[in-house]
Amino acid sequence: MAGHSKWANIKHRKGANDAKKAKYFGKLIREITAAVKQSGNDIEVNPRLRLAIQNAKGANMPKENIDRAINKGSTADTADFTSVVYEGNASHGVALIVECTTDNLNRTVANVRAAFSKHGGSLGKNGSVSFLFDRKGTFSINAADVKDEEALTLALIEAGAEAIEHDQEEGYYHIISSLEDFGSVQKELDNLHLEPVSASLQYIPQNQVELNEETLSKVMKLIEALEDNDDVQKVYHNIANNTE
């Protein structure tokens, strides 16, 4: 089952409801704006912006929304953004890594700490749980764009891909690479004229914990509270249950 594998956290999924889609768009817009503010609006020299735009396109964000986010990042009076990662524990050995992009660190850490406290978790120090995860490059591409699966597999493995999965139900190929080979796999996808619908560096759990229904419900309330925070870009966990 997908929920019991390393693929569960990285899959690009279709059919999000309107509220979740709007929230996700907001996070994508913030990442585009932050990327431009940090390194300019030229995707040829700003890989962070390139990934952010790629992911926005993969989520079917309208071009005008993307352009507005780029223009906002180019404006001098737009606040500077900082990327920060928090680590903590939920109930029953669940480890959480929370990636944020914020223009106010004090606000963000206060809100993240409050979410952990309210839902029975505890915010830890840097390094408190990250050793339980591996930092990996991940890509999702439309299966319909792939003409020769064997050729794709050979080319990507040669470029440094560690694993490739064809998710026939969702209609995607999912690819995992090491942190070091992320750029070379991305370049090979360019050479193959395959544009990912999502591409990012993620935290993949080394081992996972199975939760009973009651505990899972409690932990998911914490994860959802964190994800509802506009400053939070992504929450990673080591739950084995299918959390979709």
Swiss-Prot record:
Gene Ontology cellular-component annotations? cytoplasm
Q: Name one GO molecular function term.
A: DNA binding
- Domain of life of the organism encoding this protein: Bacteria
Keyword DNA-binding on this protein?
Answer: yes
User: Where is this protein found?
Assistant: Cytoplasm
Matches recorded under Pfam families: TACO1_YebC_N, Transcrip_reg
Keywords associated with the record? Cytoplasm, DNA-binding, Transcription, Transcription regulation
Name a single GO biological process. Answer: regulation of DNA-templated transcription
Coarsely, its chief localization is cytoplasm
- What's this protein's family per the entry? Belongs to the TACO1 family.
Q: What is this protein called?
A: Probable transcriptional regulatory protein Aasi_0624
Which species does this protein come from?
A: Amoebophilus asiaticus (strain 5a2)
From the broadest rank down, the organism's phylogenetic lineage runs:
Bacteria, Pseudomonadati, Bacteroidota, Cytophagia, Cytophagales
